[in-house]
Amino acid sequence: MPKIVDHDKQRLLVAEAAWRIIRRDGMEQASVRNIAEEAGISAGSMRHYFSTQSELLLYAMNLVSERVSNRIKQMSFNGSPMENMKLLLLEFMPNTDEKMAEMEVWFAFTAKSKTDPALKALADKVYDEIRQAIATVITYIVKLNLSRANLNEELEIERLYALVDGLSIHAVLRPDQMTYEIMENALSLHLAALCRAEE
């Protein structure tokens, strides 16, 4: 009797194998042969799951975005407005080992997207979604009348986006210096600085 293979599960296992290679050996080693070996399948059987290497890499890159989106959908926002906003923003930052692994892979894909149109389209879409989430945080602060006087919303969106992105990059490149605690404290201080002083 032929072995029944769960196609979606196998695609996921292959993508996770690609992640491991990218984290351990770099994007240049993420060949079909190397990924197949890491996944424990033959290179020939890879075509049953992905027709091209580009399709595989696009799927693996999109998997990072899907995992972040799924975590956000499952979040319960039960704290204060500031706590809730911080929780949301931390989903885009590598403040756990799991998210650090995802971020390392994401940045490798982002670098490759400079020369791969399909990856670039996905990267642009995801970065636009992150910017929209950050814009929502700034709008929320203003609508709740928490913001300091004369807050320039457009400028503050860019500043907060730069902070989230910059802290994330530093955490990936220098995890010994940009610890999870420092990252979270820097975000908290920035959010507090956006708000008017309590009377």
Predicted regions and their residues:
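N-terminal intrinsically disordered/low-complexity leader segments
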Residues: 1-9, 198-199
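Residues in soluble alpha-helical coiled-coils and helical-bundle/repeat scaffolds
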Residues: 51-55, 76, 80, 97, ...
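Generic hydrophobic, amphipathic alpha-helix propensity
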Residues: 7-18, 35, 60-64, 68, ...
